[in-house]
Amino acid sequence: MESDATTSEPKASVGSDSSPAEQTVLATLRDSVAAPTRGFMSPVRSVVASPRPVKGKAARRRLQLPPVTQAETCDEEPVPAVPEDQEEAQPLPPIYASPMRGMWRSEKVALYCDQVLQGSKAEDAEEAMSRYLLEKLKAKDRWLGVWKSNPELFFEKYEEASIPFVGILVEVTCKPRQNLSSCFKVTVSVAEPFSSNIANIPRDLVDEVLGELEYSAPLLEVYPVDGQDADVRDIALALEVVRFFYDFLWRDWDDEENCENYTALIEERINLWCDIQDGTIPGPIAQRFKKTLEKYKNKRVELIEYQSNIKEDPSAAEAVECWKKYYEIVMLCGLLKMWEDLRLRVHGPFFPRILRRRKGKRDFGKTITHIVAKVMTTDMVKNLSSDTLLQQHNDLNLALDSCYSGDIVVIFPGEYQASNLALLTDDITIKGVGKREEIMITSEPSHDSFVVSKADNVKLMQLSLIQQGTVDGIVVVESGHLTLENCLLKCEGTGVCVLTGASLTITNSEITGAQGAGVELYPGSIAILEGNEIHHCNNLRTSDSSKSTLGGVNMKVLPAPKLKMTNNHIYNNNGYGVSILQPSEQFFIVAEAALNKGAASGDKKDDKMLSKVMQTLNVEMNNNRIEANLKGDIRIVTG
C-alpha cells in the first residue's frame, strides 16, 4: 500500500508507433495527472490515506473455518481449520478516548491555528504536524498500544463491515529520526498477553505479518492503551490531533494552491466540521458531503494504484482510463470546494432551486380541477358547479405535473409524497378536504427541497406538511407570492424561508420543530402573519451563541423586509420569539416605542430587551402573544 501511495509520476509514455492523437492525449495526461498525485508523495499522508476499497463481494476469512456446507455451496475450497489447541487471543484493553469531540470549536481553532500550525503555509503543514508530534514522542520511547491494521494484511477475503480492522496489542518503540516525516513509522512487537479483537487469529500469522513488515508500523495506526502515565496520555492526544487533521481538515489540493492565510482556511473547516456535528447542517446533506469526501479520497488511491500497474509503454486505452479517473477526481474536487465555500448552511439559499419554465394557461383557456384520491365518488364533487372540468389522479405528483396556471388541486384524506411540490412555477391552488391533520404530505428524504415556489400566486390550504430528511426550508418562496392557510407545518430542517423580493402570507397555521427559525425573512422580502402558532423551533444543537438566537420569526435586514403580525402566538422556542439580524450597530436607532405600539403584554415582558431597531425597518405588530421563549421575546441580533 505504501509503495503505491508514493508514486510520483503517472506512468504514461508514448511509443514510436503512436498516432498524433494518442501522443497528444498521453502528453496531456502526464501534465494533468501529475498534479493531483503529488499529495501522495508525503509519507504522512500515505499513512492516513483512506483504505483501498474491498475488491469483490466474497466475504470469508482465510484462516477462520466456515461450515463445510457453506464452502461447498459457494463452490470454493474448504479453508484449513485453526488447530484446536491454538490459544485464543485475549480481548483488547481499552484505549485512550479521543478528546476531539469534547473540545469546543474555539479550543480546536486555538489548538490547530495557534499551537500546531502557527501561521504555516499549506506546503509547510506536514512539517508542522511532524514537529508537533515528534516533540510529544520525545517524552516516552516505549509504551503499549493497539495496532489497528488493514485486514488485507491478514485475510484474503473479508466483510469490511464486520472486520473494519485487525487489532493487535503491541509494544511500541519510538526512535528519534533525523527526517521529520520518518517519525510516522515506529517499531512494534507483540505484547503479552497476546490480545486481539479476533479471538481465533493465530499468533504465528501475526508474527509472520510483522516479520514481513520488518516489525514496523505506521504510528497513526497505533492507539495508546488507557491507564499509562501522563506522557503516554499526551502522546495519545497528539496522535488524535494529527489523525483529525488529515482525516477532516487537510485536502490534497491544499499545497497545490496559493492560500495567503492557511490557518484561516483551517478555521473555516473546523467550523464546518463542528456545524456537521452539532446539527447546524442537517444530517442528510452532511452525510452527502462526507460520502463525497470519502469517494474523492478513494478515487485518488485508485488512480495511484492504477498508475503503479501501468507498464513503461502504456497503451492508448490505459492512457484514456487514467484520464477518466483523473477527470472524476477533478469533478469531485470541484464539488467539495463549492460545498466548502457555500458552507452548507441551512440558513442561506445560495442558488435557485427551480430551473423549470412556467407553463402558463392552457391553449383553450379553461382550467381543470384535479381530484387526488384513490377512488372518486359523486359525493366528492357534489359541491362543484356543473361546468367544472375534472381530472382524477391517485397520485399527487401526477396531479401537479398535469397542472396549468389557474388549476385547482383538491386532495382527499390520505398520505402523499410529491417531488413536484418543489417545482411550483404556475399559479395554482392546492387544498385539502376535511381536517388538515388527515391530509398528510411528507417530503422525500432523497430530495434537497420540499415545497418551493416561484409562481406569482400559489395557495396551499388545509394541509399537513411533514418534513423528513430534506435539507432546505420546509417551504421556500423564491419569488412571487405564496399563501399558507390553515396548514400544519412539522419541520425537520429550517422553517419557512422567504427570499429577497418574494412575499408570503400565513394565516391560521401552525409551525413547529424547525432547526432554525420558524419563519425566516430575507432582506427585501414581505410577510403577513395572522392568527398563527409558532412554537418549539430552533432545535439546533450548537454551542455557537449567534445561532441559538433564532426562534419563532427571524428577520434579516439591509434592505429591510416588511412584516405585519396580527394575533399570532409565538411560544416555547429555544431562541427569541422574534429576532432581527443586523450587520452592525452603526445602523441602529432608538425606536422602542414604535415597535411596541399595539403589542400585547407578552411583547413587553422585558422593556429593556429591545432598545434599538433599524431605521428603515417596516414592522407592524398587533395583539400578538410572544411568551415563554428561552432567550426572550424580541431581540436585535448583531451579525
Swiss-Prot record:
It is found in: Cytoplasm, Cytoskeleton, Spindle. Expressed in pachytene spermatocytes and elongating spermatids inside the seminiferous tubules. Not detected in ovary (at protein level). Testis-specific. Keywords: Acetylation, Coiled coil, Cytoplasm, Cytoskeleton, Differentiation, Phosphoprotein, Repeat, Spermatogenesis. It comes from the Eukaryota. The modification O-acetylserine is found at S3. The modification N6-acetyllysine is found at K556, K631. InterPro entries: Beta_helix, Carb-bd_sugar_hydrolysis-dom, PbH1, Pectin_lyas_fold, Pectin_lyase_fold/virulence, SHCBP1-like. Disruption phenotype: Male mice exhibit decreased fertility and produce reduced epididymal sperm content, but do not influence the rates of motility, capacitation and acrosome reaction of sperm. Meiosis-arrested spermatocytes are increased in the early stages of meiosis and undergo programmed cell death. Display a diminution of the HSPA2 signal at the spindle and disordered chromosomes during male meiosis. PbH1 repeats lie at residues 479-500, 501-523, 524-557, 560-582. GO terms for biological process: cell differentiation; positive regulation of chromosome organization; spermatogenesis. Residues 54-63 have a biased composition (Basic residues). Residues 1-25, 48-75 are annotated as: Disordered. Testis-specific spindle-associated factor that plays a role in spermatogenesis. In association with HSPA2, participates in the maintenance of spindle integrity during meiosis in male germ cells. This is Testicular spindle-associated protein SHCBP1L. It comes from Mus musculus. The lineage of its organism: Eukaryota, Metazoa, Chordata, Craniata, Vertebrata.
